[in-house]
From Swiss-Prot:
Enzyme Commission designation: 5.1.1.1
Top-rank taxon: Bacteria
Cofactor(s) it depends on: pyridoxal 5'-phosphate
GO cellular component, one term: cytosol
Family: Belongs to the alanine racemase family.
Name of the encoding gene: alr
Name recorded for this polypeptide: Alanine racemase
Species this protein is from: Coxiella burnetii (strain CbuK_Q154)
Biological role stated in the UniProt entry: Catalyzes the interconversion of L-alanine and D-alanine. May also act on other amino acids.
Catalytic residues in the record: 34, 259
Residue numbers carrying N6-(pyridoxal phosphate)lysine: 34
Alphabetized PANTHER family for the sequence: ALANINE RACEMASE, ALANINE RACEMASE, BIOSYNTHETIC
Amino acid sequence: MNRATATINVTALKHNLSQIKALAPKSLAWAMIKSNGYGHGLVRVAKALSDANAFGVACIDEALTLREVGIKSPIIVMKGFYNEAELSQFARHRLGAVIHCSDQVSLLEKTNLTSSLSVWLKIDTGMNRLGFSVEQSPAVYNQLKTSSSIQKPIGLMTHLADADNENKTFTELQIKRFFSVTEKMIGPKSIVNSAGFFAYPNALVDLIRPGIILYGISPFGINYNSFKEKIEKKFRPVMTLSAKIIAIKNRRQNDSVGYGCTWSCPEDMPIAIVSIGYGDGYPRHAPSGTPVLLNGKICPLIGRVSMDMIAIDLRSQPNAQVGDDVILWGEGLPVEIIAEKAGTIAYELLCKITQRVQFIEIEK
């Protein structure tokens, strides 16, 4: 079979959650599995992370998918509800809602629910995306407190905009704003994402929201090394993306390789054609020199990424054969490196794996 393969190590996934809980023993872990479990498979990840205290998803469709397969854990929908029909489903399926705008508050006031709703008040401390301003939040909190449709206490949360930056000025300001505005509010608090989890121990409050680190990937990329050793030592990559060599060719000096003739052989040399391309989710903008792993050694990508194939330089691997597995990222080759080469972030690469990639689960 010549399809690219994403191997998902569920043992590594469980291990990473256990490490997170060990590093923050006083906090509950709210596992972020939005965007199809960061590309790893929504249901697969949820079933593997049964020890999580709750799951975070982006939209109601993701939450309902989990309920349909029997996931009974608390689920919080980060974008909340947008109409009465959705709100009724939240109550029916016991879904938690993030409340971030006045329209949602109005819906709560005018809708008769079959059961009360668990909600989290989103306070915008500087992300300037979703949430009530610091000035608005006390009044909204008091308004929600009077609603018979809402379970008490009300959850209180914010989102950090710049926690992966070595300059801590803005994030410290956000945390200060959050603690100040919630000082007189009663309810569980949640502040940190994956980067905040490592960089701001003072913000490890009632609930933490680990995302990318669950999958064994640094939220800091490769440029912020303060936590590099801890992450490499304690966390394991969950996804390994691989594909097979489908052809080996001996090319002459000055022969060009791939579309646009952007790369030419500096000497007579062997090259391999690997069965993966941007149609599988490998980044088209990955430049020549982007590393792949073949038989435990690094080989560089050469030429443009095609829809279905890439070419690699085999001068360091003269004994390579058709059928050999090539690792594009994962175990032995961090996806953060590929993201850096391609001018993007690991999150995007993981979320863009396409349906034609074969997914295999292992326990290792």
